[in-house]
Amino acid sequence: MKLVFLFLLVTIPICCYASGSGCSILDEVIRGTINSTVTLHDYMKLVKPYVQDHFTEKAVKQFKQCFLDQTDKTLENVGVMMEAIFNSESCQQPS
């Protein structure tokens, strides 16, 4: 299950360009996702505009809880991975 959530997070930036994701809203959601000090309640307030139904809300809660269950080192590594993706050649903004 953890691998599924990780792949979900990894596929988000495929549509984005530039340093970071190039999308401030996406960057904020990713930071909230991998930040262990962001509570489930605060995270749900952050993503509320994008949660349209009860099923999505339940999935988002499980998604965040997965990250809350990880060690700080694992969360730090996810952040490093996201930066590597955003700074990769395939994610660079065209000149």
Swiss-Prot record:
Highly expressed in ventral prostate. Glycans are attached at N35. Induction: Androgen dependent, as shown by the decrease in the level of the protein following castration. The keyword Nucleotide-binding does not apply. It is found in: Secreted. Residues 1-18 form the signal peptide. Prostatein is composed of three different peptides called C1, C2 and C3. These form covalent C1:C3 (F) and C2:C3 (S) heterodimers whose non-covalent association forms tetrameric (C1:C3/C3:C2) prostatein molecules. Part of prostatein which is the major secretory glycoprotein of ventral prostate gland. Steroid-binding protein; can bind non-polar steroids, cholesterol and a group of small proline-rich peptides. Belongs to the secretoglobin family. Lipophilin subfamily. This is Secretoglobin family 2A member 2. It comes from Rattus norvegicus.
